[in-house]
Amino acid sequence: MTYNLHPAILVLKDGKFYRGWTLINSIISFGEVVFNTGMTGYQEIMTDPSYAEQIITFTYPEIGNTGINHEDNESNKIHVKGIITKNICFSPNNWRQQESFINYIFNNQIPHIFGIDTRALTKHLRKTGSMNGCISSQYLNPYLLSTKFKDRLSIESSDLVKQVTTSKNYEFQGYSHKHFSYLQYKTDKMYGYGLKIILIDFGVKYNILSRLDNYGCSIQILPATSSYETINAYNPDGIILSNGPGDPSIITYAIKTVKKIIKYTNIPIFGICMGHQIISLALEGTTFKLKFGHRGLNHPAGMKQKAEVTSQNHGFAVNQESLYKDTINITHFNLNDTTVAGILHNKKPIFSVQYHPEASPGPHDSDYLFKYFINLIKHFKQYKNYKNSSLAQAR
């Protein structure tokens, strides 16, 4: 298939603009412009619900080299508002490839622009912070496009979770296709067999479900708006609070629900990314917006002399000073900027991390946390009490 190139423009809210090319004529798309430093994983990133309402700048200069397959999607649709690249590979080659990247973006009409200086753009975003922007091939006048930002809501004032959460309760039955995972061949399917896990869906990635399924857990997925009474009626052995997009402080309904779960039950809880922030807010902590966020596959997280290389994708973080030391232990810091990356409750079986142990894309250093969660559930079911233990001991 042959494609025509059309001139396109990226305009930022501060007036900065970049000209490039697109394969789609007459597009216009608004979103928060952010950058991801990963060399791979573009398919997982575009289908990750945590990227809702965002335009992603890929800092790696060549995107699309390994094509697209039908197994690596992290949800059932594309969530990004657009993508920005230096170059797009027109001749990909990979043994798992089922479609070229250019076919994928053209067939799905994904707003995009390429041929711009992504290094200069990334340096600008690092200096000024993430901001709203627009990709357009419909209008090419930057001053005209600048006037269209007035009615655009910021990430901080939008409840993005309600856009991506499931609309109904359902039980995870595995995938109709084979969801590829290197780790599925190294997991004991009987290790968590029979355990009832409730997952609160703030924008869950498929691989979180896949990792739990690989351990043999029974997984019930509930909407983010589920009440304490609804969750408790399932009598779960454990609860996972998933990843998700946007500002966690806006998700007041979930914060209130988690606060009740913590107060009235001793159910083990594991929070991932947005789930980590929701737990912190339920424990009277606060969050703040990062200048340009953490989005990449090689963020070091740890404490003292031991660190994990982690996959991260968030624009908000927990304020360390807001956490009560008599209630919460900080287990991990982001070693790039010392923001809180993991916490452990002192008196209840609750822990959370500000990164993605399921990877997809990214390293597997923190995959042990799923097994730790299962061990926590087993311990509580057997002894009916919680003995505080270091996360490091679970490796």
Swiss-Prot record:
Q: Name one Pfam family in it.
A: GATase
Q: What does this protein do?
A: Small subunit of the glutamine-dependent carbamoyl phosphate synthetase (CPSase). CPSase catalyzes the formation of carbamoyl phosphate from the ammonia moiety of glutamine, carbonate, and phosphate donated by ATP, constituting the first step of 2 biosynthetic pathways, one leading to arginine and/or urea and the other to pyrimidine nucleotides. The small subunit (glutamine amidotransferase) binds and cleaves glutamine to supply the large subunit with the substrate ammonia.
What is the protein name given in its UniProt record?
A: Carbamoyl phosphate synthase small chain
**Protein EC:** 6.3.5.5
Span list, region CPSase: 1-192
- Main location, first listed in the record: plastid
Provide the residue positions that the database annotates as binding L-glutamine: 50, 244, 246, 274, 277, 313, 315-316
Q: Which branch of life, at top level?
A: Eukaryota
Which family does the similarity line name?
Belongs to the CarA family.
Q: Which Gene3D superfamilies does the UniProt record give?
A: 3.40.50.880, Carbamoyl-phosphate synthase small subunit, N-terminal domain (3.50.30.20)
Record's Gene Ontology CC terms? chloroplast
Q: What organism does the UniProt record list as the source?
A: Gracilaria tenuistipitata var. liui (Red alga)
| Record's subunit section | Composed of two chains; the small (or glutamine) chain promotes the hydrolysis of glutamine to ammonia, which is used by the large (or ammonia) chain to synthesize carbamoyl phosphate. Tetramer of heterodimers (alpha,beta)4.
Q: Name one GO molecular function term.
A: carbamoyl-phosphate synthase (glutamine-hydrolyzing) activity
Which pathway, per its entry? Amino-acid biosynthesis; L-arginine biosynthesis; carbamoyl phosphate from bicarbonate: step 1/1; Pyrimidine metabolism; UMP biosynthesis via de novo pathway; (S)-dihydroorotate from bicarbonate: step 1/3
Q: Which residues form the active site?
A: 273 (nucleophile), 356, 358
Instruction: For this entry, list what GO says about its biological process.
Output: 'de novo' pyrimidine nucleobase biosynthetic process; 'de novo' UMP biosynthetic process; glutamine metabolic process; L-arginine biosynthetic process
Residues covered by the Glutamine amidotransferase type-1 domain: 196-383
Alphabetical keyword list = Amino-acid biosynthesis, Arginine biosynthesis, ATP-binding, Chloroplast, Glutamine amidotransferase, Ligase, Nucleotide-binding, Plastid, Pyrimidine biosynthesis
Q: Give the UniProt subcellular location, in the record's own words.
A: Plastid, Chloroplast
